[in-house]
A protein has these predicted regions:
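Outer-membrane beta-barrel translocator/channel fold
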Residues: 174-197, 248-324, 328, 407-415
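C-terminal structural cap/anchor segments
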Residues: 293, 298-375, 380-388
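Transmembrane beta-strand segments that form the barrel wall of outer-membrane beta-barrel proteins
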Residues: 43-45, 134-148, 173-175, 209, ...
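Repeated loop/turn-to-beta-strand initiation elements of outer-membrane beta-barrel proteins
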Residues: 79-81, 131-135, 170-174, 182, ...
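Residues that define the transmembrane beta-barrel architecture of outer-membrane proteins
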Residues: 33, 61-67, 117-121, 155-159, ...
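Surface-exposed coil loops of outer-membrane beta-barrel proteins
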Residues: 98-117, 122, 132-212, 222, ...
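Beta-barrel outer-membrane channel/assembly domains of diderm bacteria
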Residues: 8, 14-141, 247, 383-390, ...
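Residues on the lipid-exposed face of transmembrane beta-strands in outer-membrane beta-barrel proteins
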Residues: 39, 67-73, 123-127, 161-165, ...
Length: 431
């Protein structure tokens, strides 16, 4: 396992610099004193209404409550620090039905009914030398080529090795080797890795390495590479720059690029895909306006492993606007109501239009054949309203309303739908 060897080598090199290691560990207060225990209560209502699918389940509606406890120990003192991370998640059905299940909030039985409750627990062992940390076990990840999601009730987790290093100021490096996945509505932490769009057999492991560097307070860059066994090699780059125009006025430019090509046994068929997005956000006081363009160059969609591994500007509430050869444009407006004396209240309205979809040249023996037509197009309008309590006994409690309207022609494939979500989060820091 090359990644594990690399991780051990990196830790050995860090240990060799004993002065640096001792200095880094000297800041540790110990296993107990640096420990943190956090609790999150999440109440989630999800409604999705398909408008043009008479031959299948066209309506999904569920309501559930989740309780998530996460513990992170400190590190033992000394040149090498040891610690553990642990979590326990519980999901409870409040309302569902056989004809309304399938929102992703709750597991579904063989009879098509949502389970009354489900839960999971896990953890990871960790060690630290200086500012380099190695973990093994079940964890959440945030890399642009492999990121677990928390867009439904309970978080996703992945099982494997992860190493992160911050030895150089402004430079954050990480690498990972993962072999199993726990999906958002599952209690099985030993499930296979999965694709969001492909079908059929996929690789059993994913490896990645990369990092980000803050060139200045206004400019940052990121580079990553990953290998999904016998499926693809994927590369990612990001450039983010903020121009301060005047007091309360700024312009942010964010560029993201993915390059994906099949490798090994090519279990998903031939893949040669370059996808990028360019977004500009102008902020003036409490107002913000966003314009973005996204392009997919390839006969397969831009696909990804894990629920949140898509760092592109036009990935929306429902659609990712990532179909073969798709071009999409986005415009959005946001307002922070603190400007009118209501701190904690924010609103956003976004519209995206995607055209030129053509998936007819996808590998006929691959995992994406037959998904898209020759002249697909679609649009999505999202409305997002969120309020966070600023003080008092309910401080940090948030209420979020999300509405999406998606319309598509037959060649696009996702169909017409209306989707509404209500998410209430109440985080607590116990330790």
């Amino acid at each position: 396992m090359n990644l594990v060897k690399l991780s051990c080598l990196a830790l050995a090199v860090a240990a060799a610099g004993s002065q640096l290691a001792v200095a880094g560990q000297a800041e540790s207060k110990g296993f107990v004193d640096d420990s943190a225990l956090k609790l999150l209560n999440r109440n989630y209502y999800f409604n999705r209404d398909f408008k043009n699918q008479p031959g299948s389940q066209s309506y999904r509606e569920e309501w559930a409550h989740g309780v998530m406890a996460e513990f992170a120990s400190g590190f033992t003192q000394g040149p090498v620090g040891f610690g553990v991370d642990a979590y326990g998640y519980l999901g409870i059905k409040l309302d569902s039905g056989r004809g309304r299940a399938g929102t992703g909030l709750l597991p579904i039985s063989d009879e098509g009914r949502a389970q009354d409750e489900y839960g999971e627990a896990g953890g990871a062992a960790k060690l630290r030398i200086s500012k380099t940390t190695l973990k093994y076990g079940e964890m959440r990840t945030e890399a642009p080529v492999f990121a677990t999601a928390h867009s439904r009730l309970l978080p996703e987790t992945a099982t494997g090795f992860h190493i992160a290093s911050g030895e150089i100021e402004g430079l954050a490096l990480e690498a990972g080797h993962f072999t199993a996945y726990n999906n958002r509505n599952s209690t099985n932490s030993d499930e296979a890795l999965y694709l969001n769009y492909g079908s059929g057999e996929v690789g059993k492991t994913i490896d990645f390495a990369g990092g980000s560097y803050a060139v200045s307070d206004d400019l940052s860059v990121a580079l990553y590479a990953s290998r999904f066994e016998d499926t693809w090699n994927q590369y990612y780059g990001n450039l983010n720059y903020t121009l301060g125009i005047s007091e309360g006025q700024s312009l942010n430019v964010d560029f993201n690029l993915y390059r994906t090509g099949d490798t090994g046994d090519a279990l998903q068929g031939d893949i040669s895909n370059t996808t990028y997005s360019l977004a500009a956000t102008y902020a003036l006081g409490s107002h913000s306006i966003l314009l973005a363009y996204q392009r997919v160059d390839g006969d397969t969609p831009f696909d990804y492993v894990g629920g949140d591994s898509i760092f592109l500007s036009n990935s929306m509430q429902f659609s990712d606007f990532n179909a073969p050869n798709e071009r999409s444009w986005r415009i959005g407006y946001g307002y922070d109501w603190a400007g009118l004396g209501v701190p904690g209240l924010t609103t956003k309205v976004t519209y995206v239009k995607g055209t030129d979809i053509d998936g007819t040249d996808a590998d006929a023996n691959g995992g994406y054949a037959g998904f898209y037509g020759e002249d697909g197009e679609h649009s999505e309008t999202d409305i997002d309203i969120k309020y966070v309590v600023q003080d008092g006994p309910a401080k940090d409690l948030s209420v979020r309303l999300r509405q999406a309207f998606h319309y598509a022609n037959e060649d696009q494939g996702e169909g017409d739908l209306h989707e509404f979500r209500v998410i209430v989060d109440y985080p607590l820091s116990i330790l």
